């Protein structure tokens, strides 16, 4: 931005060095990517455990297992991403994103690579976890129906805001 400040959890991000910004992101921000971004060499359980272990959580295995159970993958803990369907991979990514209990979660086209039925289930899961955990959800989508479910919407065209609702 050319003016103003960005604050997250009481931290003025522009005043922090890169290491401190990375720490704030790790402690307060979660991401769900359209392309899942799972580590191929790790199982579903290990992918979800990773941010918990990096945060020094002694209960990483239990928390990751519980989250995978919550997203319906309790029987797929030891499966690698290549052994999972697109919808299953996205559910692992969602579990990983919520693992560290972020204050804010950015979801970039979370249903973009999924068929409509799987996409609808993923949306239900995202909104359910959002409500249960009190996480602020910032959702980027081209799906007008999905956007309509959000409390607030911003519409961009050519990189500029053209409308706001909610």
Q: Model-found features: residue ranges?
A:
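H-loop (His-switch) and adjacent beta-strand-loop-beta switch element
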Residues: 153-165
